[in-house]
Amino acid sequence: IKILVPDSSDHPFADAEKYPDITYLHRPKLHFLLKLKEVLPMISTPYVLYCADDDFAVPSGIAQMTAFLDEHPDYSTAQGHYLTFTPRKGKISFYPRYIRYFDKQVTGETPRERLLQEKNMYASLLYSVIRTRAFQRMYAACFNPDGSLRFRNLFLAEEFFNHAALIFGKYATLPYFYSAREHITGSAAETTVPVSVIKTSHKYREEY
């Protein structure tokens, strides 16, 4: 697994040199999509995935996703099962995430059919394993010919990923442990605006 870390925090990671197998880029306060624009040409593997800084991706689970995609060229993306954990007073509480979608698949033969299937699915595809070609094409579409961003709202960026992934191909949730996510107060999981609000709110209407 090759790891790219485009870090937009104020201060660089002091121990980056201790990890020569990781490509580390310090880009303080740079917009998420602009960081992606820089790293897209660096992705040399056939598949790619996000791993948030409060997540623990499971290598064996990733291997199961890539094996599935190798065998199913009509699928663009796949992910497994998630577990959320919360440290509390010396103990750790665990609970499954997206339990209603343990076996979810989006298998329509056309992009329109797949988008209609996805309409009521609240489990995001953002952290799934996806084909690199699809990943690069979807994010190339986020920029105008002059290099400026078509939109800046990161809630919309996740919704854009969900739709674009299904335009490129089918999706599967596979029965493998894929990722552990720490529940942290103030994390994105607590501040993310629901899709239902994004689709109907005047605040987001123009970009949506």
Give the ranges of each region predicted by the language model.
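Nucleotide-sugar donor-binding/catalytic module of glycosyltransferases
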Residues: I1-T200
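C-terminal, non-catalytic tails of nucleotide-sugar-dependent glycosyltransferases
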Residues: T200-Y208
